[in-house]
Design a protein with these regions (language model features):
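Short beta-strand/loop motif that positions the catalytic acidic residue
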Residues: 125-126, 131-133, 137, 156
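Conserved loop-alpha-helix segment in the C-terminal half of the alpha/beta-hydrolase fold
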Residues: 140-156
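Serine-hydrolase catalytic machinery in alpha/beta-hydrolase-like enzymes
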Residues: 2-82, 165
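Acidic catalytic loop of the alpha/beta-hydrolase fold
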Residues: 135-140, 161-162
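Gly/Ala-rich beta-loop-alpha elbow adjacent to hydrolase catalytic centers
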Residues: 84-97
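Catalytic histidine-centered segment of alpha/beta-hydrolase-like enzymes
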Residues: 159-175
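A conserved short beta-strand
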Residues: 102-116, 128
Length: 191
């Protein structure tokens, strides 16, 4: 792996198949080193995909949605593979419009479905998108989505915005395994 320059931040490139790359986008307080994104990247690596992680956190005072879209744009501009899949957590879903415009498949972990713009942008997906959220997450509002036929919605009962069950580490680990398994199936279905 090697560090790459993304302008205002760095990226970490894990090199495997140069023709296939997952772009891993952090949330506002959820870095690419946190469990969901770490294991999403690991799943992709076992399938031979390269991965480009955005190594950044929201600077104090910045517009969070503008920050998320900017970092996504910079990472996508840097990804040189023929096949690119976006994997993003929470605030990263602010870039769903950019992903739709670039006709890319995506995995959105706990997307902000309480935000009309995010919902509208997700509904414009031109390639398959996997959305995973927990029923105990206030921003998880899957009924807000229009059924485009390309959105695969997975709801995990009793899980919060971190896709954890507070006070139950074993159940949280089971959830992490379920998320990794579902991401693996999604990548397999893409071919």
């Amino acid at each position: 792996m090697r560090r790459v320059d993304l302008g205002p931040c760095a990226g970490l490139l894990h090199e495997n198949d140069p023709d296939r790359c997952v772009v891993v986008l952090p949330g506002m307080r959820y870095t690419t080193q946190a469990p969901l994104l770490w294991f999403a990247r690991e799943v992709a690596a076992t399938r031979g995909w390269s991965a480009l992680e955005v190594l950044d956190s929201l600077p104090e005072g910045d517009d969070p949605f503008g920050w998320a879209r900017d970092r996504a744009r910079r990472a996508l501009d840097r990804a040189e593979a023929d096949e690119v899949v976006v994997i993003g957590k929470s605030l990263a879903s602010a870039a769903a419009g950019l992903v739709a415009d670039r006709v890319l498949p995506a995995v959105w972990l706990t997307p902000l479905l309480d935000r009309p713009r995010v919902v509208d942008d997700l509904s414009r997906a031109a390639r398959p998108a996997l959305l995973i959220g927990g029923s105990a997450d206030e921003v998880w509002v899957p009924d807000a989505l229009a059924d485009s036929g390309l959105l695969q919605v997975v709801q995990l009962d009793g899980l919060d915005h971190s896709l954890q069950r507070p006070g139950h580490p074993g159940a949280s680990l089971d959830a992490l395994r379920a998320v990794a398994t579902r991401i693996d199936r999604f990548l397999d279905e893409l071919g």
